[in-house]
Amino acid sequence: MRPLRYSINVTLDGCCDHREGFVDEDLHRHATENLDQADALLFGRVTYEMMEAAWRPPAPTGARPDWMEPFAQAINAAKKYVVSSTLEQVDWNAELVRGDLGKAVQRLKRESGKGLFVGGVKLPQALTELGLIDEYEFVVHPRVAGHGPTLFAGLSTHLDLKLVSRLEFGSGAVAMRYEPRR
């Protein structure tokens, strides 16, 4: 069974608005390594549309630094599954996921391969409620946003996690990986 991994950038006060983190070469390299651990990505509509707008080729010449190219290539090549009840179709190497979320994700996890990687905020919360995420990574940035959406707001019950690794970056960000205590 393929593991389902979740990684998100978050500030010290729990804000998970992508505009509040900061990006550097080390963090992008780490994100690319995360993508390389998965056969496919799982997005909700909002995250899919945001990532497609940011990363789908062609990027205008000089639009981003050269060190972002490995991530751009990895995300463009990746198979994507998009959970949406409103989109009629997707492309960018993507397939719509409809119907019962738990059953659909269990089916994807049963397929052979390296793993699945989920991004965003709302979809991972729903998957957490269903007990389907096998690994959580929080990349905590040394910033207090003071506003914005927070991670797991409204989760119906607490989630106990066990730290399995920690990685510090020169920027002061820390990537902490956890597995659920079951």
Regions found by a protein language model. Name each.
Residues 139:
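Non-cysteine beta-strand/loop elements that form the S-adenosyl-L-methionine
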Residues 1-132, 142-182:
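Portal/gating segments that form or line small-molecule/metal binding sites
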